[in-house]
């Protein structure tokens, strides 16, 4: 059996031979030799490549005019009366105005975007989005036909649980999920029970052109696996329910210390409330937990949440 010194001598000899040959450069560890293809990291700094990339992006945008750019998880946080839902609804409304071909999936009743689509099973066992009244399959061509008849038309699916994150898809045209009181679905007390399929959907939003927007009274109440995937946080504040000021926090750079978030503020937003903003949704609607189980896994009953906090 080779001693540690013998392993080191063998690794050094292998290192010298492969370095001269230029094939690969090994990394020496206590367990042996890990080979790394060194040439793959040698790239010339070609400035033309940057211009070619910009040209490619312009052409892509021209060929895909309805491509859905927003992605990642955004949380509006603040206590009751802080204007977090008002701010979040305003944010979602602006996105829907900018991207009319996107699908909205939410647990909030929007005045301008009534529920008009449902998630329904297909004969092959898969789930799809269909029109609530005609039961027609909703495709991009179907959406284009409706927009040609009514430019203010938007597809809106009622959120019915975490499964919607997987079932509602819209290709490059995007899906925006707005989940009010998101901590009721994914909270810190149940972080160990989060199914891997949920995290797959949350962590791959960019590839699927999905954007999750949620609200939470306490940011730290959200499950830790979810907090690790949050890109941005909006800390909401309201003065006399008239003036709103929000801090935009970089969720990826901010750190948690002693159960508190040490924010890295990257922006601010200010605006006055208006009757139009309040008319956009039912401000007194009560949110609920949608599923007692997800993918066959039972969830903690609501009354246990407070019992386990003590």
Task: Name these PLM-found stretches.
Residues 27-65:
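N-terminal pre-Walker A segment at the start of P-loop NTPase domains
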Residues 101-102, 173-176, 208-214:
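Loop/turn-to-beta-strand initiation segments
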Residues 113-200:
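Conserved nucleotide-sensing/catalytic segment adjacent to the nucleotide-binding pocket
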């Amino acid at each position: 059996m080779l001693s540690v010194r013998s392993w080191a001598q063998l690794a050094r000899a292998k290192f010298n031979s492969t370095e001269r040959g230029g094939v690969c450069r090994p990394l020496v560890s206590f367990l042996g030799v890990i080979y790394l293809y060194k040439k793959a990291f040698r790239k010339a700094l070609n400035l033309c490549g940057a211009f070619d990339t910009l040209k490619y992006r312009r052409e892509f945008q021209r060929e895909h005019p309805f491509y859905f750019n927003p992605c990642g998880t955004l949380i509006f946080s603040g206590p009751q009366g802080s204007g977090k839902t008002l701010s979040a609804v305003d944010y979602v409304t602006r996105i829907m105005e900018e991207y009319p071909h996107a699908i909205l999936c939410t647990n909030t009743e929007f005045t301008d975007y009534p529920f008009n689509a449902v998630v329904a099973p297909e004969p092959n066992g898969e789930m799809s989005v269909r029109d609530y009244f005609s039961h027609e399959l909703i495709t991009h061509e179907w959406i284009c036909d409706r927009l040609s008849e009514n430019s203010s038309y938007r597809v809106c699916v009622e959120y019915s649980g975490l499964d919607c994150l997987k079932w509602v898809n819209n290709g490059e045209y995007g899906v925006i999920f707005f989940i009010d009181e998101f901590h009721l679905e994914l909270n810190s007390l149940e972080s160990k029970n989060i199914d891997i399929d949920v995290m797959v959907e949350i962590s791959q939003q960019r590839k699927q052109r999905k954007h999750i927007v949620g609200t939470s009274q306490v940011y730290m109440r959200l499950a830790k696996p979810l907090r690790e995937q949050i890109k941005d946080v909006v800390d909401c504040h309201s003065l006399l329910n008239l003036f709103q000021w929000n801090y935009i926090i970089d969720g990826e750079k901010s750190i948690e210390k002693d159960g508190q978030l040490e924010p890295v503020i990257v922006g601010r937003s200010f605006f006055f409330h208006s009757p139009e903003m309040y008319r956009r949704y039912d401000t007194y609607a009560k949110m609920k937990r949608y599923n007692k189980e997800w993918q066959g896994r039972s969830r903690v009953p609501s009354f246990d949440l407070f019992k386990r906090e003590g």
